[in-house]
Every structure is written in structure tokens, then in C-alpha cells.
Amino acid sequence: MQKVTIQEAEHLLQEIMSEEDDRFQILIKDERKGVQKLILKWYKQKELAQKEKEKFLEMSKYENALREKGLTYIAGIDEVGRGPLAGPVVTAAVILPEDFYIPGLNDSKKLSEAKRERFYGEIKAKAIAIGVGIVSPQVIDEINIYQATKQAMLDAIANLSCTPEYLLIDAMKLPTPIPQTSIIKGDAKSISISAASIIAKVTRDRMMKELGEKYPAYGFEQHMGYGTKQHLEAIEAHGVLEEHRKSFAPIKDMIQK
């Protein structure tokens, strides 16, 4: 291989998968600083990819153990929106195929919005089934947020296109005959729960952005209904909306004034 430009070396390294590649052996002997920087970057990317693969395998242990018992339809379930002062609580149930692989998958709260959106599209395209459950602020006020979250999770299961054989749930127990395991911080320990957290988060964020367009003075598209200074000041200035949870402090106190 004749001497290549720095740009050509960069393109080659994008194609090269292994140190054993003859082209890599030539590039690694190239003493130009630009090429050596690219080699270092290549090693760092490989190290990151390996760490992501190991993390993904670790997060697949619950699903793999159940598959070894002959189960196929394993649903991960998670919620988003228990804490906000406005908007619904949203849950998702996701059944993934055995060959599912998205490196970098993690708890939705630890991902950037751009990454969540990308993963959302990939999960939607690859999942065996996805069900979403949405419970309104009015119902939250009637039955409390804990019961509303359980109801939303049961709705998400009911909205799946196939019946799950097993449930992996983030920190909840559900009143259903389907066998289940509750996992504390499950969105960082199970790929199915992590996928569900991403579906639920993106679904709810999109709903809150629509609310932001409907009520521009409240800034819902920025705080997603959480009790930020901006949100509380907007409530003081413009009043409580039907989308607010009237059983939540400080909304409850504002109404009683």
C-alpha cells in the first residue's frame, strides 16, 4: 500500500476492524503525527465499543436466563413522569427479539435527547411488540400517583400485540397472573426495561412539547412539567391548568389559598 494522505488514512481506519488487517500494520508504522493521532482515536473507539458490548451483555442477563428456560415473550416495563406537577404518567412495555443489539443502551435519563430519539427509532423498528400506557393528571388526582403508575403499566401490557410470558419491571409489583420480577434501578440493569424507559420517555416528552405549543407561557417543552423555578413562576403568573396535578404540592396549596 502506497503512502496515503491523512484524510485517506482516516477513511481506511473506519473500514479496518482488526489490528491484524495488513492496512493497519502499514498505518501503525507511519510516523506522521496526524496518522498516529488517528491510530490512538481508533484504539479508543475500539475500547469504548468493547465496554458497550460488555455492558449490554451484563444488561441481558435477566432476559438470557429466562430464554434458557424456554421463554420468548419477555416484556420490560418502565414508567416516566411520576414526579412532575403537570402532564400524564407514561409507561411502556417492550418485548425484544433474542438478536436485539443496540450498543450504548442505558437508562433513558442518562442519555442525551438526540440519542434517545435515535434509540427510540431503532427499538420501534426491531422490537417484537411495544405497548404504551398513559394515565391523565385527573386520574392521578383521583387514585394517587402510585396506583396511577400501576394502572398505566397494566394498560401498557394490555396494549402489547402479543401476551408476554414474563415481566421484568422497574421497581414495581403488578397485580397480574403473569410471572414477574421487580428490579430496583432496572432501567440500568435490563435491556428490556431500558428499552421501555426510552419509549416511555420519548413518548411523554413529545406530549409535553405539544403542551408547550398549546400553552407557550408555561415552558412545558423545557421542564416537561417538573417543578422548576420557571414552571412555578408561570403558575403564579398565569394560574393552574387542567393539565396540572391538583393533588401535588405546591399546586394543592395554591388552589387552597
Curated annotation (Swiss-Prot):
Membership in a protein family: Belongs to the RNase HII family.
Catalytic activity: Endonucleolytic cleavage to 5'-phosphomonoester
Protein name: Ribonuclease HII
Cofactor section: Mn(2+); Mg(2+)
All residue ranges annotated as the RNase H type-2 domain in the record: 72-257
GO cellular component term of the entry, any: cytoplasm
Broad enzyme group: hydrolase
Cofactor binding note of this UniProt entry: Manganese or magnesium. Binds 1 divalent metal ion per monomer in the absence of substrate. May bind a second metal ion after substrate binding.
